């Protein structure tokens, strides 16, 4: 007969957080909302919420949704994902988290910032939940701890280690020895999981503390979903990966620099510390810290490891490709130092070399343009004939394939498009686990006049399929 494991009653405490109703479509929703609100002005709370509600109402099938649903979406986006900040006078404005996502369009970067500051207790939870966690002594950063479990498992065994939401919940997430007392380390948790597997020990999710009023227990899925949420967000951040049924989570060893940055994270919101030895804590005292919590989350920026970058193989491949042309066209042996920079721009640079390969002797004119020049485009390329092609690169990177036909231009970029006409191109690079493709728009000003593009007052562009054409990104592989 199999042994059954449960957390001892004296150590059991259910950690929970807001669960977005749009979690199955979270990447698409967050990108849409970030694009839509990033240029909103600082407004009184009621007016800001009305404008955000209008944005949410226009997403997907929400036009027929009840107002309560829209309000819930707004609360989840504001609280869990920190899309809104507040001034000292109570007015609201788009947060750095929202603005950065709208500007960069990299969902994996967004989720790394999100996980970097995610903790219990925190302002993403309701005040009474924060108070309960403080009274239990909880201080827990799940992302860092989960990565420490994988790190410890590698030290304990040479076998590949995987983790399930069930194991994480039962051996760590709901155990006060982990989340509050810190007497059970990540090494202990990894050892516990490995030994339970070896001894074929099963887990029971039927805790008396979770029994419902009707006498029934919540399902296993309901019990394990909170730990599962964090594991899923870590997949979206490219820290973990899944295989097959997505039941088992593995460390994404392709991103060790990224993983190490999280492991070295010392940031922690400590404004609740004064309450841990306080007998009575009021909702008002916790509520007073909400603005500081969202300011804390949004203070982090320019973390290099979080920005998408070429891995060593990609760098080698593109370096060989570009070197070929510089050596051939200019007799130079050294690779130009400005070749590598923005992830999307570098991939498009390689694409342009491959697009013109063997068809022109002018590849030396294909170059990245320094942002400091402010010319309104990222790359100078060539046509097969004698004309030049001026390319503005817009990139979106997500785990899943998402429906996105929106990007933002600057006034300078739009002015250049008007001046350069048919020589001006927008390359909208879309990257996800299924591949990399480019939607190419030539002469966006003309497309706008033909009603194939919509552009709002903030230069947010929404394009129709007829505005351009899709092409696969041309990629080189010289290193094999």
Report each predicted region and the residues it spans.
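Donor-sugar nucleotide-binding helix/loop cap in glycosyltransferases
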Residues: 1-314
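A short, surface-exposed helix-loop junction/capping segment
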Residues: 53-56, 206-214, 319-337
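Catalytic cores of nucleic-acid endonucleases
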Residues: 393-437
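Domain-level recognition of nuclease-like catalytic cores that cleave nucleotide substrates
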Residues: 424-480
